[in-house]
């Protein structure tokens, strides 16, 4: 797959016009993907840029909700910052973003609300302002008999 395979206009991975190629290049530039050449083979990119290509692919579909599972695992600090910037902008634009992450600092910094799960059950809902690493970890490891389990999330 190349970077040009991103747009929703090319379901078989073949671009039909320069407009689609320009749209792919624009999305890659918006994510600061290096290089932003839509003809570049994705697997030749760094891990961080590969993650940004995957994100760009979904953004080209104009999704209203994104589910990001470990979006920054294995990427460098610069790519993490770029992904965080994009997630924050998407959320501010009204796009629903659900982030699944084992990095507590990531959740504390990105989320307006964090649901903490333990053994397949939601054990706490923490507002973004109160979502510190310490608070999230406290809920994640608290003994079940002393921590009430959420029955309903409103």
What function would you assign to each model-found segment?
Residues 1-154:
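Glycine-rich phosphate-binding loops of nucleotide-dependent enzymes
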